[in-house]
Amino acid sequence: MFADETGYPALRFKRFSTAWEQHKLSKLTTKIGTGKSKYKLQDNGRYPILGSTSVIGYDNNFDYTGDFILTARVGANAGNLYRFSGSVKITDNTVFIKSKYNKFLYYYLQKYDLKKLSFGTGQPLVKASDLKNLKILKPRLDEEIYRISKLLLSVDNLITHHQHKIDNLKLLKRALLQKMFV
C-alpha cells in the first residue's frame, strides 16, 4: 500500500482513477535470475558483457537478448540499478530482471532502494530469490504504466542533457583558468 494505506498514489495523471494492484515482482516479470555467462574478452567482440555496474568488455557470442534491469549481486554496489537493451552476456555477479514493464519497474525499484535487501557485514549480497518476493504496486492499466515511464524517462533525459552541459562548462572554466592565470 501507499503511505496513506490506500491503493491510490498521491499524484496521478488525469483520467486515471483506479486503485493500483499489489503483486510479487516475480508475477510481473518473465525472468529474474543471476547471469551465468561464460565469456572470453575479445578485442573486437560484438556483444557486450554486462557486469555488476556496466559493460566490462565484449564477446563474439551472446546468451541473453532483450531489455534488462540489472543490479550488482554482491559488494558495495549491491542493489544499484542500471538498464540495458540488446543481445548480451551477463556475469555471475549480476542479477537481471526482464519484464514487459521494465521501464516502470526500473523507476519503481529505484524508489524501493534495493540496498535494503542486501545482507552481510563484509560483502553485501542481493539475491534473485529475494527480489522475486518483493511486493510491487502497479497501475491496472498499461496506458498509465506507459505514461509514468515516459514521464520519468523524459526527466532522466533532461538530467543527462544538463549534466553534459555542466561537464562542458567545467572544462571551459578549467581552460579559461589555465589561459588567464598563466
Could you tell me what each predicted segment is?
Residues 4, 112-116:
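A short secondary-structure junction motif
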Residues 12-35, 40-49:
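Non-catalytic DNA-recognition/assembly elements of restriction-modification systems
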Residues 20, 24-25, 37, 49-52, ...:
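Non-catalytic beta-sheet/beta-sandwich ligand-binding modules that flank or precede catalytic cores
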Residues 45, 125-126, 170:
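Short amphipathic alpha-helical segments embedded in low-complexity Lys/Glu-rich regions
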Residues 48, 95, 150:
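Conserved, well-structured core segments
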Residues 51-110, 119-123, 127-131:
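A short beta-sheet element
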